[in-house]
Regions:
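Acidic, low-complexity/disordered tracts enriched in E/D and polar residues
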Residues: 1-54
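Long, charge-rich, low-complexity alpha-helical segments
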Residues: 42-104
Length: 104
């Protein structure tokens, strides 16, 4: 079973204030930009993940399957799990190809 695990060489942090602002804006029905809510540092480069990418990243602990992660995301955004499964799989696949995740 595929349980994505973050690359331990990547230093990362959650921009909690920014994440809270974006979640509040979404709840109010406002459009949100793709501002980073999670910052990754790798090989001297800084990368930002938007809200959804950041929420997925935070759950890639080697304990949860892709389906578990999709389920959590579906709950967070009050949608059916099937609506997010493909996006979660594609995002995890992309980060795995970059070497940022592995299959735990």
């Amino acid at each position: 079973m595929n349980k994505p695990q973050r690359n331990p060489e990547i230093v990362w942090r959650v921009e909690k204030r920014r994440q809270a602002e974006v979640l509040k804006a979404l709840e109010a029905g406002e459009d949100v930009d793709d501002s980073g809510t999670v910052i990754l540092l790798l090989s001297g480069m800084m990368h930002q993940l938007n809200l959804v990418g950041g929420l997925i990243w935070q759950q890639c602990d080697g304990q949860k399957t892709q389906a578990d992660i999709a389920g959590e995301l579906a709950k967070e955004f009050s949608v059916e799990q099937v609506e997010v499964e493909t996006d979660v799989a594609e995002f995890i696949s992309d980060l795995t190809e970059r070497g940022w995740l592995s299959n735990g």
